[in-house]
Structure formats: C-alpha cells, structure tokens
Regions:
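Acidic/histidine-enriched ion/cofactor-binding microenvironments in catalytic or ligand-binding pockets
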Residues: 201-203, 225-239, 325-340
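Charged (often Lys/Glu-rich) extended helix/loop segments that serve as interaction or gating elements
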Residues: 243-390
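Short, hydrophobic/amphipathic alpha-helical packing segments
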Residues: 29, 185-192, 228, 232
Length: 390
C-alpha cells in the first residue's frame, strides 16, 4: 500500500475498517499465473474472503464453495454458476436438490463420504439430471475418503447420471516444505495412474490445495516465490495426463487486505507502554501468530518526527488476550493515529470471533485505481444478534 496515496482517503472513514485492494489482488493472480503457466487452472477458495469473488470472476477458473451461505453469495454476486465447485464436508439433500433444480449439470460436486455419493445419486436420479463429481481423498482427518473407498466407488462407477471427473486433495495451509509438496504431488500422480491401470478410469481433473505460505511477520524469511516456483516445477513432472487445478484462498487473497484501526488510549503500566486501539483480535487474524510475539507489517499513518518507542498494541475487548502485537517500535505515536495492518485479505474479516462483546462489525471497503473506494459493507451492530430477537 502507498501510504501517501491513501493518507487523505483513509481519514474519511471511521475506524476500524478493512480495505481490499483489487489491483493488488489482480497482481497476485497474475504472478501465480505467470509461474504456473496456462495449463494449470486456478480455483479460488472463497472462504478466505467472499467480498472479492466478483473481482476474481474473470481471472480464476472456478470457485470452491463450502456452504449454502457461500452458494447464496455467489448467486447474489451474479457469479457464473458454471464456475462453482460445491464442496464442504456436510451437504444436505435439499441443498443439492436446489442446486440441481436451478443449475443442472453446470456445477461440479465433491464427494466426501459414501453418504455424499448416495445423496448425489438419489438427487440426480430423482431429477433425471446428469452431474459431475470429484472424489476427495483424505489426508488423514475428517475430510474426504480413504483410498480404499475411492477405489470401491471407481470400480463400480457405472451410473446413468453421475460422471466422476477426478480427485480432490488438500492437507493443510502455510506449508513451507518443498519436499512435502513434492511428496504429495508424487503420491497423487501415482494414485491417479493406478486408478487407470487397475480400473481403466482416466482422472480428467486433479484439484489440489497446495497450501502455499504467506509471509506475515517481519522476522520471517519470505519464501512465497520460492514455494510457488517449486510447485510449478513439481506440477510439470506429473504424468497422469489430466488437468491440474490448484485450490487457493489465502495465497490469492492475503496480500490485498489492510486492516485500519485508530489509537484511542495510551498508558504505562509497570514500566510497559500500552497503546489501546478501537479494533482488536476479534477482527484481525494472522495464521501462526503466537501470543502476539510475532510482528506483522504495520504502517503508522501520519507518523511524525520524535522519539521511537516500543508499544504493546491492545484492542478494545475486555480480555487480557486482546493483544495485537507486543513491543512494536513506533515513532512518536499519539492518540488518534491510525495503524494499518497489512496482508489481512484472507480470513481476518471472516474467521475472527466477531460477535464477542457485541462490538460492531468493521466497515469493508473495496479499492481500485479505476473505481476508487466502494463500500462493500457498512459498520454493522452485532448487539442485536446477541440477545432475544424482539
């Protein structure tokens, strides 16, 4: 973010708020595309940040949609529903029926269990509608299915309405081991080849969530580009013959986000300087932060000449856990100053404990050089959600 460019604009809005810069979003997608090449598809996991899906529609190939709520957001945004992959560990019969009734065979569905397969079988047969599915291979948790069950489904796959497109696999986020990526892709490549060798089943699509890392903290070594390029090389070595689609959320969205909060109080307790801001940990989420010890990149807006001093930045929640960062050096920090936390484009706006203490939800702004600022969501009161609806 160019601090000077936004210096005036951000003072027009009441803190706390988020800014999602869609120019930065587009740059990140272009960087990913440039490394991977034209043959690899991009699937955006919208749980990372649903507010930017319309801005991504023309630059990604598909959207991973994991709940009825996310599905409704896609409809409201006017997303091409042919780009939707209906995922999620829990699928209800009525949700599948709705999707089939309204969108026919446009959507791809993931199969996470035998009951998912049975639900999709029942719905497609009832509605006489062909559907396409991906079978999710488990990585050793509650998601997906064992290899043996996938083999069983593939072996008996003859079905009038269900077409198995391929395999889906995801094992975690913030991976910093090239070897782990290589081993996972080698395992998947071998599994896909075995499905063809053993059952004559060609895997047309492999959807893989690489979990590439975002460098959030100043003291971390930035390995984003190294991991991306290593992933691209590993994909080129695959031999199963189908299309590879990379499911990404954090790696696409994180760089575009900024969380802006204001200093509302300052004090010194037992020799430590505390700065209270009007936001808090319920609105800010950095994966890997440990007891506020790690230092994210923070811009101090309108900082002035004066003494540099370490401040522990705390939010407005009535809990000792509401510490955003400890002993961060600011120059002449004063009440009313605005602090901009960077790389908050993924999960901060959606994953925080936003209803705690009935604090208002922050405003969300979408920015681009072409359109300037757009309000995607105003400040919203949460107290109405935390008591009986009268």
């Amino acid at each position: 973010m160019n601090e000077k460019k936004f210096e005036y604009d951000i003072h027009e809005y009441q803190t706390p708020f988020y800014i999602f810069d869609t120019d930065i979003l587009a740059e990140q997608v272009n960087k990913i595309r440039g490394a991977l090449g034209e043959d690899v598809e991009l699937c955006y996991a919208m749980k990372a940040n649903p507010f930017v899906i319309k801005d991504l529609e023309e630059v990604v190939d598909s959207f991973e949609v994991c709940s009825p709520g996310e599905f409704a957001i896609c409809e409201r945004a006017g997303i091409n529903m042919g780009k939707v992959i209906m995922s999620g560990v829990h699928k209800k019969l009525e949700d599948v029926e709705y999707a089939l009734n309204h969108y026919g065979d446009k959507i791809i569905y993931t199969v996470e269990s035998l009951s998912h397969w049975q639900i999709l079988d029942a719905c497609s047969t009832l509605l006489q509608t062909p559907i396409r599915v991906l079978l999710r291979l488990t990585s050793g948790n509650q998601f997906g299915m064992d290899e043996s069950l996938i083999r069983q489904i593939v072996e008996g796959r003859a079905h009038e309405f269900i077409t198995i497109e391929g395999i889906q696999y995801f094992s975690g986020t913030q991976k910093k081991s090239i070897t782990k990526l290589e081993n996972e892709l080698h395992m998947l490549d071998q599994f896909c080849r075995e499905l063809y060798q053993d059952y004559g089943f060609p895997v047309k699509r492999l959807e893989y969530g690489p979990g590439l890392p975002i460098c959030y903290f100043e003291e971390e070594k930035n390995e984003e580009e190294l991991m991306l390029n290593s992933l691209a090389l590993s994909i080129k070595n695959l031999t199963f013959g189908g299309t590879v689609a990379l499911e990404m959320g954090r790696f696409i969205a994180a760089p575009c986000g900024f969380y802006v909060t204001s200093v509302v109080d300052q004090k010194t307790n037992k020799g430590e300087s505390y700065c209270i801001v009007d936001g808090g940990i319920h609105q800010l989420n950095y994966y890997g932060q440990m007891l506020a010890m790690k230092k994210p990149n923070i811009l101090h807006v309108n900082h002035r000449e004066g003494e540099q001093k370490e401040w522990t930045v705390c939010g407005s929640l009535c809990t000792v856990n509401d510490v955003l960062v400890k002993k961060y050096p600011f120059q002449n920090l004063q009440g009313g100053d605005r602090l901009i936390f960077q790389k908050t484009g993924a999960y901060s706006a959606t994953e925080g404990m936003s209803l705690f203490l009935s604090r208002d939800l922050p405003q969300i702004l979408i920015y681009s050089a072409k359109d300037g600022f757009r309000i995607a969501r105003p400040h919203l009161q949460t107290n109405v959600l935390n008591y009986f609806q009268l």
